[in-house]
């Protein structure tokens, strides 16, 4: 490629490449965000079109994923041909090729005549793949310029191939009089066709096998993919107005529900109002509902744990965690309603614990999550998870999985319960944060509610529905928590969609504006040359945010140093780590005992040795007195 002439130095030409690189990054981000879940169900329509007349010969629609939505297509040969085989009298060449007595579908006799001729089909999406490098021609030859280019059809030599996308055969005819459609064709997709990309139409050529010139008909097969409920954007961006604090009504409701709920008719109405309320709630209300629903579920299962506790919603990822469970899923041939509500984007669950039901080929790294493993089912089946559960696959979170996708991608899924990441704390843990001298007696214990309520859907409440008032109560409280989680996930999906559209619109506007300005100032050498700018770039203001964060960290560091300077040397030890406090309290007793032994041990030992020696001397004296007798002494002076 030749470089365009430019009057400015070479450094002025660097910005367009930087812009292309920047926009390329934007498109990569957009493509990553727009990558849907492979289990997403769409309304897929297959259209067969006569290329020569641009008329639609057949259109078949079905619900399914992009992997298994390959139905059998039925089309009539006369609809596929149209008027292209009708005789053209003024042209002698055409008259010789298309005899008015044998071709076309205008009369009943001609329709019956088409049933007697074999036909063969040649692909136009790969015209060079003939036998031994034979060129198969173009559209004027029906892509069948040489024998061996045909890949399917209904002829005596039975044309086949291992790489073409479709097979075309004759169907059964029910109309012997040929007053209607009497030349049915059956089009089926091959395994290669199911693996191919159908982003654009693909063309084939169909020719009748007869003596002389074989008539040609060109047709194309295309796929149209539409979502079940197409999104409609109206008004401003919904992401920014959604960031609002909790409403007072939600706070008042939370105070009322802190007591033990009773079995009344108001409980179902509160659940129904939460699902059918037309008012759009904000981020603050959604977070409050998650904590409130968690409390109600925990209070319904174990009221003793909710007498004095703290429930904290974790503000850092992961926001949800999964508990693997065992359950009975529903196996259906048509997509159930739960499959139609599959998220548009892939949601990843980074933390899954426990053991449950696994479907597919599970690698060794994840076999610890499987208590029961099933290989799945062959064919087109949809496995819907039980109410309140999801399938956690390595391609994302989904309430319904397609076995065609699972078998084709070698994917695996685990049946899980989805819980918000809410930690359970004893009251002492919170009180220490309000104490000026923070001292932890031991390492604080924090449990997630998922570990405390795991298996509630399948093994606990769901199994006890209808057995009494407690089961009904716990089911209602758990359902309210599920509604809160569903609302939060739905809001997350809407936010991602809105951000995706904003990014796409921004990249399109940047490209259009820059391309238009460069074309407008083409004679001057481009926009930068016309503005006489040596450097054209986008001013990124994230540096200001980075500087402000650095200043904030510096102020926090100064406050920490001031706080440490006001403390004594002994108090500073216990504020460094709770592990240090636990270690000191554990070894202080043995250390004091050892110190006392070292100080008082020698004195006590000396006294003990002296006492033993004295007793030994006494014993020796007693032994000597027993073996000898005392000699009596007489005084000579005494009479």
UniProtKB/Swiss-Prot annotation:
What Pfam families does the database record attribute to this sequence? TLV_coat
Keyword Disulfide bond part of the UniProt annotation: yes
User: Source species, please?
Assistant: Feline leukemia virus (strain C/Sarma)
Biased-composition ranges, Polar residues, are 246-273
What is this protein's record name?
Envelope glycoprotein
Per the record, the gene is: env
Q: Which GO terms describe its biological process?
A: fusion of virus membrane with host plasma membrane; symbiont entry into host cell; virion attachment to host cell
Function (record text): The surface protein (SU) attaches the virus to the host cell by binding to its receptor. This interaction triggers the refolding of the transmembrane protein (TM) and is thought to activate its fusogenic potential by unmasking its fusion peptide. Fusion occurs at the host cell plasma membrane.
Annotated signal peptide: 1-34
Keywords for this entry? Cleavage on pair of basic residues, Coiled coil, Disulfide bond, Fusion of virus membrane with host cell membrane, Fusion of virus membrane with host membrane, Glycoprotein, Host cell membrane, Host membrane, Host-virus interaction, Lipoprotein, Membrane, Palmitate, Signal, Transmembrane, Transmembrane helix, Viral attachment to host cell, Viral envelope protein, Viral penetration into host cytoplasm, Virion, Virus entry into host cell
- Extracellular topological domain: 35-583
**S-palmitoyl cysteine lipid sites:** 603
Record site: Cleavage? 442-443, 622-623
This protein's GO cellular component annotations are: host cell plasma membrane; membrane; viral envelope; virion membrane
Domain notes from UniProt: The 17 amino acids long immunosuppressive region is present in many retroviral envelope proteins. Synthetic peptides derived from this relatively conserved sequence inhibit immune function in vitro and in vivo.
Which segment of this protein is annotated as the motif CXXC?
A: 309-312
Stretches in topological domain Cytoplasmic: 605-639
Instruction: For the motif CX6CC, give the residue ranges.
Output: 528-536
């Amino acid at each position: 490629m030749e470089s365009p002439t430019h009057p400015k130095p070479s450094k002025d030409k660097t910005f367009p490449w930087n812009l292309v690189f920047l926009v390329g990054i934007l498109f990569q981000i957009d493509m990553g965000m727009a990558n849907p879940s492979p289990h997403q169900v769409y309304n897929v329509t297959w259209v067969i079109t006569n290329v020569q007349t641009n008329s639609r010969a057949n259109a078949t629609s079905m619900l399914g994923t992009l992997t298994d939505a390959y139905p059998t297509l039925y089309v009539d040969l006369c609809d596929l041909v149209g008027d292209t085989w009708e005789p053209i009298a003024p042209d002698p060449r055409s008259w010789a090729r298309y005899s008015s007595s044998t071709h076309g579908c205008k009369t009943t006799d001609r329709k019956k005549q088409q049933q007697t001729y074999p036909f063969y089909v040649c692909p136009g999406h790969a015209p060079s793949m003939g036998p031994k490098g034979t060129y198969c021609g173009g559209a004027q030859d029906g892509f069948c310029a040489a024998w061996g280019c045909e890949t399917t059809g209904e002829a005596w030599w039975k044309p086949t191939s291992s790489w073409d996308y479709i097979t075309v055969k004759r169907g059964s005819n029910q109309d012997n009089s040929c007053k209607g459609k009497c030349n049915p064709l059956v089009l089926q997709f091959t395994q290669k066709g199911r693996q191919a990309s159908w982003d654009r139409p693909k063309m084939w050529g169909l020719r009748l096998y007869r003596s002389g010139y074989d008539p040609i008909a060109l047709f194309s097969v295309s796929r149209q993919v539409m979502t079940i409920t197409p999104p409609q954007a109206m008004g401003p961006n919904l992401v920014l107005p959604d960031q609002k604090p909790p409403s007072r009504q939600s706070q008042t409701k939370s105070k009322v529900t802190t007591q033990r709920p009773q079995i009344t008719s108001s409980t179902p109405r509160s659940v129904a109002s939460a699902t059918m309320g037309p008012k759009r709630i904000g981020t603050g209300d959604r977070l409050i509902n998650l904590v409130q629903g968690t409390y109600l579920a925990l209070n319904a299962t174990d009221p003793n744990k909710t007498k004095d506790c703290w429930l904290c919603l974790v503000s850092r990822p992961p926001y949800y965690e999964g508990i693997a469970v065992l359950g009975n899923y529903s196996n259906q041939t048509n997509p159930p309603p739960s499959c139609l509500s599959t998220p548009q984007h892939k949601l990843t669950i980074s933390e899954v614990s426990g053991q449950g039901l696994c479907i597919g080929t599970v690698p060794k790294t994840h076999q610890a999550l499987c208590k029961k493993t099933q290989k799945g089912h062959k064919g087109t089946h949809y496995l819907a998870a039980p109410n309140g559960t999801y399938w956690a696959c390595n391609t994302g979170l989904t309430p319904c999985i397609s076995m065609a996708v699972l078998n084709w991608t070698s994917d695996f899924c685990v049946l899980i319960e989805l819980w918000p990441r809410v930690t359970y704390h004893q009251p002492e843990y919170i009180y220490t944060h309000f104490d000026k001298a923070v001292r932890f007696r031991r390492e604080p214990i924090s449990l997630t509610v998922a570990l405390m309520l795991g298996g509630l859907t399948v093994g606990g409440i769901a199994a006890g529905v209808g057995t009494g008032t407690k089961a009904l109560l716990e089911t209602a409280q758990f359902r309210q928590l599920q509604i809160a989680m569903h609302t939060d996930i739905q809001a997350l999906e809407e936010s991602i969609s809105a951000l995706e559209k904003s990014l796409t619109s921004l990249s399109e506007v940047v490209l259009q504006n820059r391309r238009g300005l460069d074309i407008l100032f083409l004679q001057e050498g481009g926009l930068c040359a016309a503005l006489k700018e040596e450097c054209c770039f986008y001013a990124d203001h994230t540096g200001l945010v980075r500087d402000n964060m650095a200043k904030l960290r510096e102020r926090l560091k100064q406050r920490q140093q001031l706080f440490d300077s006001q403390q004594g040397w002994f108090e500073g030890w216990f504020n460094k780590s709770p592990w240090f406090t636990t270690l000191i309290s554990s070894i202080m007793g043995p250390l004091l005992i050892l110190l006392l032994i070292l100080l008082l041990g020698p004195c006590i030992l000396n006294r003990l040795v002296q006492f033993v020696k004295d007793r030994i001397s006494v014993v020796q004296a007693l032994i000597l007195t027993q073996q000898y007798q005392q000699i009596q002494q007489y005084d000579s002076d005494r009479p």
